[in-house]
């Protein structure tokens, strides 16, 4: 589960986000038609090898008859990595035009195992109702129903929303807590800011980036899952991600981006 939060975590929260179940938010970071691609690298026996690629697209669509944003993230391992570990993941979400989460689905194949997580959102009387579904690797269907009084997000919807947050005034060490839902649970997560750095992407361009870390709470302690670097401009594009996985370490580097809403002012000349 953790490695799928990376590209998303990559963009989490530039302000407090879970105070109450009044969940609309403005969007000034992306527009319909945005498309991002990445190279993936995996550390195999102390050697970094090209592991595959990832792509993310965002378009305006409809959900249950209403206008909505549709975002999808797909990762694919190459033949070389498939010999060691099969990686086939697809994430999909819908968000209202006011950035309220509506739906989330993650289909992931790791090795010979395949699982699905789904979250369905609805909003009534200041409450958020969640219908959660998980198809386990053994073929078992698990369902859960929850009603909460604060906003809840999944790994992809938080990505869309967080890109419009403003990090001005943050100091190194600043932390933000927020809830993340999957097909079974609602879990505490945390974002830690560590200042600005310059990062070279796989397109040969160097960017001024915000460095952040995504942490999850396990056994009462927060554990670092990924360090990520997002462009220091209004787009907040993930440029590089360093992932700490149970089966090793991985990195992702930006290759291309098109259909951006704002000028890329973070390029280092």
Regions of interest found by a model, annotated:
Residues 124-180:
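Active-site/ligand-binding surface loops and adjacent short beta/alpha elements
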């Amino acid at each position: 589960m953790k490695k799928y939060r990376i590209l998303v975590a990559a963009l989490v929260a530039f302000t407090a986000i879970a105070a109450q179940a009044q969940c609309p938010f403005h969007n000034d970071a992306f527009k319909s038609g945005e498309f991002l691609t990445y190279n993936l690298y995996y550390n195999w026996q102390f050697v970094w090898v090209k592991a595959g690629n990832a792509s993310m697209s965002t378009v305006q669509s409809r959900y249950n008859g209403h206008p909505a944003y549709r975002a999808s993230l797909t990762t694919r391992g190459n033949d070389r990595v498939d010999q060691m570990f099969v990686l086939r993941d697809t994430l999909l979400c819908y968000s209202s035009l006011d950035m309220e989460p509506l739906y989330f689905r993650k289909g992931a194949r790791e090795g010979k195992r395949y699982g699905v997580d789904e979250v369905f959102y609805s909003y009534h009387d200041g409450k958020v109702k969640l219908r959660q579904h998980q198809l386990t690797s053994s073929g078992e269907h698990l369902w859960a129903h929850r009603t909460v009084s604060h906003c809840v997000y999944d790994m992809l919807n938080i990505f869309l929303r967080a890109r419009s947050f403003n990090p001005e005034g943050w100091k190194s060490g600043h932390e933000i807590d927020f809830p993340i839902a999957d097909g079974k649970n609602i879990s505490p997560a945390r974002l830690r800011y560590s200042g600005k750095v310059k990062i070279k992407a796989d397109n040969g361009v160097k960017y001024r980036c915000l460095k952040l870390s995504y942490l999850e709470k396990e056994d009462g302690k927060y554990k670092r899952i990924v360090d990520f670097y997002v462009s220091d401009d209004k787009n907040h594009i993930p440029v590089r991600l360093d992932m700490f996985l149970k089966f090793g370490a991985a990195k992702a580097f930006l290759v291309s981006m098109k259909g951006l809403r704002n000028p890329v002012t973070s390029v280092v000349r």
